[in-house]
Swiss-Prot record:
Pfam families: Herpes_UL37_1. It is found in: Virion tegument; Host cytoplasm; Host nucleus; Host Golgi apparatus, Host trans-Golgi network. InterPro entries: Herpes_UL37, HSV_ITP. The gene is UL37. It is an enzyme of class 3 (hydrolase). It comes from Human herpesvirus 1 (strain 17). It catalyses: L-asparaginyl-[protein] + H2O = L-aspartyl-[protein] + NH4(+); L-glutaminyl-[protein] + H2O = L-glutamyl-[protein] + NH4(+). The keyword Hydrolase applies. This is Inner tegument protein. Plays an essential role in cytoplasmic secondary envelopment during viral egress. Interacts with the capsid via the large tegument protein/LTP and participates in its transport to the host trans-Golgi network (TGN) where secondary envelopment occurs. Modulates tegumentation and capsid accumulation at the viral assembly complex. Plays a role in microtubule-based retrograde axonal transport to promote neuroinvasion. Also plays a role in the inhibition of host immune response by acting as a viral deamidase. Deamidates host RIGI on two asparagines which becomes unable to sense viral dsRNA. Residues 568-1123 are annotated as: Interaction with large tegument protein. GO terms for biological process: microtubule-dependent intracellular transport of viral material towards cell periphery; symbiont-mediated suppression of cytoplasmic pattern recognition receptor signaling pathway; symbiont-mediated suppression of host cytoplasmic pattern recognition receptor signaling pathway via inhibition of RIG-I activity; virion assembly. Belongs to the herpesviridae inner tegument protein family. It comes from the Viruses.
Amino acid sequence: MADRGLPSEAPVVTTSPAGPPSDGPMQRLLASLAGLRQPPTPTAETANGADDPAFLATAKLRAAMAAFLLSGTAIAPADARDCWRPLLEHLCALHRAHGLPETALLAENLPGLLVHRLVVALPEAPDQAFREMEVIKDTILAVTGSDTSHALDSAGLRTAAALGPVRVRQCAVEWIDRWQTVTKSCLAMSPRTSIEALGETSLKMAPVPLGQPSANLTTPAYSLLFPAPFVQEGLRFLALVSNRVTLFSAHLQRIDDATLTPLTRALFTLALVDEYLTTPERGAVVPPPLLAQFQHTVREIDPAIMIPPLEANKMVRSREEVRVSTALSRVSPRSACAPPGTLMARVRTDVAVFDPDVPFLSSSALAVFQPAVSSLLQLGEQPSAGAQQRLLALLQQTWTLIQNTNSPSVVINTLIDAGFTPSHCTHYLSALEGFLAAGVPARTPTGHGLGEVQQLFGCIALAGSNVFGLAREYGYYANYVKTFRRVQGASEHTHGRLCEAVGLSGGVLSQTLARIMGPAVPTEHLASLRRALVGEFETAERRFSSGQPSLLRETALIWIDVYGQTHWDITPTTPATPLSALLPVGQPSHAPSVHLAAATQIRFPALEGIHPNVLADPGFVPYVLALVVGDALRATCSAAYLPRPVEFALRVLAWARDFGLGYLPTVEGHRTKLGALITLLEPAARGGLGPTMQMADNIEQLLRELYVISRGAVEQLRPLVQLQPPPPPEVGTSLLLISMYALAARGVLQDLAERADPLIRQLEDAIVLLRLHMRTLSAFFECRFESDGRRLYAVVGDTPDRLGPWPPEAMGDAVSQYCSMYHDAKRALVASLASLRSVITETTAHLGVCDELAAQVSHEDNVLAVVRREIHGFLSVVSGIHARASKLLSGDQVPGFCFMGQFLARWRRLSACYQAARAAAGPEPVAEFVQELHDTWKGLQTERAVVVAPLVSSADQRAAAIREVMAHAPEDAPPQSPAADRVVLTSRRDLGAWGDYSLGPLGQTTAVPDSVDLSRQGLAVTLSMDWLLMNELLRVTDGVFRASAFRPLAGPESPRDLEVRDAGNSLPAPMPMDAQKPEAYGHGPRQADREGAPHSNTPVEDDEMIPEDTVAPPTDLPLTSYQ
């Protein structure tokens, strides 16, 4: 039927791709109504014909309203305010002129129908989001004001319709006000927006279930506005804010749980700070109540969990362990690292911390100790029987709860209570990926891979990581459907190897996510909106058409069906007229010749020209479906996925959808399918984003369903007329499908390349760092190290030149930190390899899909084949990079640490046997110690017999390695003199050596000599004499003793002795009899020369009261030994 006015290419008017077009649905409706405002007077020749001007005006009016209802283009608030008054005026005038139920329904419900099309995009900033919502509120108030009610009253129309001004104003304004209140309350509790406001009350907040804050905004009272864009955007913004509060409040319950051990509470606090209270711009911001609580908790921790600094310096440390150790040592959750050379205790991370007889961790939250768990998972160590039973009990209980619940809040609380926070899940996945990437299962017994503990950790971490990822956006809004589909589709590809190892591949993980985090379907909301529209149509039909069905009822319901299908993946459940029921039964209303004559009048883009009685005849329906739907299929399938061709195809699809509207029933939902096809193709006409593979599949499915309808109509007409059916929509014959699939496949390839590019850069950076650290450590341990007893020197060559010196603890800490940098680079390499592996898996699956599509095209050099070759080339490059980079993870040992590891292993065995021999009561441990010594010596002799490989680095390279590793370690300053480093111990330092002293005077009592006159006259003479008081005598004696124990520093100023005061004696010091004669005490002139000298009996510094000749020069101990 291409000769009936359907051009292969028609001129089109392009629209702006940015934002709603200036010629939007509201402007087009306004232009159509303005043209129909004054209908022409019917003439005698066309009084009763199909070309009656009144009939044509009515048909055009209904077509304009149908186009507005079915349009998927959004309307800007400014356009709505500008067009509202004239649009309502034209509608009321046309209703007065025609009295149609459609004009009444559209005028009465236009505020609600307009609100459902207002475009809104809320920014992430709360202030801007509130301003945008205020713009929507002002627009709604403008279109539902008193002017609107007055205009409707003047035209004899209702203002209290379901989507009328009264209901919409009340419902929309109430919803926006409530949304603002709820959102502001959530922002007040959100740790991201109000960290400083988190006080004692906030730290005691009750848990907030996921999605609860938006529950009052999705009640049936707001069903009529639920699909509106401002409602959907508001729910999305509120979900992003409230979900953070939900996760924060669930985590907050554990930091002060009295049933947990102090270490467990402290670890939960650190995880809380790292997860919610740390930002790249400001670092960790800890509220004072939380800081005080953490300090109190740390003081209760058993010190046995910490390893002493000197012993900890010998161990390789991870960044996460350093974070925990530093925070516990400094009693501050802000501390994340220690300065180089700092001696600091280290928290234990060995598997023994999980033993049941060690009360460090609570059994209900063992997974919160992330450094210990990561070490357990990555190294594959076998815990003790008690520790394994304890871990399995927690893991099995947690996994069972996850598998047997459908509540997101229950799953989130279960994960966090067990210690599986979002960051911990990521770390555990990285550890398990590192275990698999390093080939660790090859070292396990034959037939074994991951252990039972590792498998359960992997299952919970995989589910938890995806649950937390979805929980950040979980909500009752349409965009969450796309988010869930994306995460669900990638869940088993991101960690494909691990999913297979733990038994979650093959759709198990995706089904678990669908059961827990699947989007809620607004079936009841859409059903309520449908019932409200049906009720409005019935009301208008009773008032203005004597109860006859309105010709736009089906159109309004198609709008709802298309929205549910394209936004929520809801298949319309409204029963359509089956194609078999349209066959004429009995005597047809019109002869076949009438049908044929009317069929010849079907031309694009005309919607009129056929009498309504013929359109309403069921016998004419197959002609319309065969011709109109067939032409729409031909135009669509032959259009390339480019703006101009697709825009022409959209015009043909809209014509097919609106043809016979009001007279011709919908058959097999053909209008719904055409509307959904228009919605899916509209982005291409606006030059928007490219198609996706899912979109291409949906369009192909819709085309196939329309083809079935059209071909069925052709088969019904075959006895009467021979019509050429449209070609089936195959990839090999449809330009639209092959171009869509090619663009979609290219888009997937581009997304994969964009994901792979930073991963490869990370791989490159990690490999470069690994190479540098490997060479540096190898050269570092090729050096010789010498000691003078308390300092270490590095000898890089045969010359006697040495580098250093450094304190042993500083060198140990520097080596430990440099090895941590090596392990950080190795972990980054493992994470990048795991992510790149997921890209390879997705690319392989995508290549298989493209192979199937390319096989449907007969000619070889088609666009799909080109894209397939590009995908294959990309897969080859990425797979090669992955294979080569994976070889770097084949070893366990830090390069350069091989011999050091052997030495430490032998030393630990000898130390353990030696300790056992010392504590042994029998000869067996001693014999074992001797045997261990023999074996160690024999091994050393065997190694020495092997020819030692020459050094691979030069002296300059070794010196550079020393400087690189020890860059931040402070060098030990050389001593001032050889004597300064020497301490001579004599009997004077031994407080228990009393053999050289006579203890007799200490036991004698005081006796008054006979020469003392105790008479009154004698005492009077005695008291009038000058006396040396006891306090002065003791002060001088103490000064002499102390000064002899110190050696004065070289220089004009000598060290000042410490003054000892008797703080327990409250009696005042005795005053001398002659306070004006300081010379009587032997050092009066020295004190008299001092300005403002105190009284002779007033306590002063000891060194100033000691005569110079009584201060003996110290000979044995420097002053610095006491400091």
